[in-house]
Amino acid sequence: MKIIHKIETYTSDGKPVLRFTVMNSSGAYMEFTNWGARWITASVPDVQGALANILIGYDTLSDYLKDSYYMGATVGRFANRIADASFTIDRKTFHLEVNDGNNTNHGGFSGFHNKVWQWEELPDGIRFSLYSPDGEGGFPGNIHVITDYRFNEDNELSVRHYAETDCATYINMTNHAYFNLCGNGKKITEHR
């Protein structure tokens, strides 16, 4: 497995945003970025054997910094909406950031999609990790999260999320990739 990483842009506060390419021996590859622990490219063979990117996304990493659709992002602390931006655990009510009407969506403005994650190479992929302190976005508990992306010689990608916290809290992580199985530049209505 060949893994390449390079800095492509910086956040407004100067943190480097990197692109990681994980390529197998057939030339198929996956790309990720530490901005939101995102999966940004899935270049795999089509039925004729030609490589095609089947993920919908942006042309540059700078575009992901402005993304409002969570393209390829690791979403958390809580994927989906929490009604009225609040919940109760053990008779204590927690008030969250409001970012979707009266609700909290995908962890609010402080969600995992809007963070620069730490990273390390794995033999067959990339591990991203993030620390979210107690009270961030209104959520209780210090939490350490990991997202592993592993790619194999059969062109299979495994995505695994792990979380560890020091108190009762809500956690519901997911990956928010969008697919066009026809490949870039083709109409999604041509899926077969």
Where are these predicted regions, by residue range?
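An exposed, glycine/acidic-rich loop-and-rim segment of catalytic or binding clefts
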Residues: 1-192
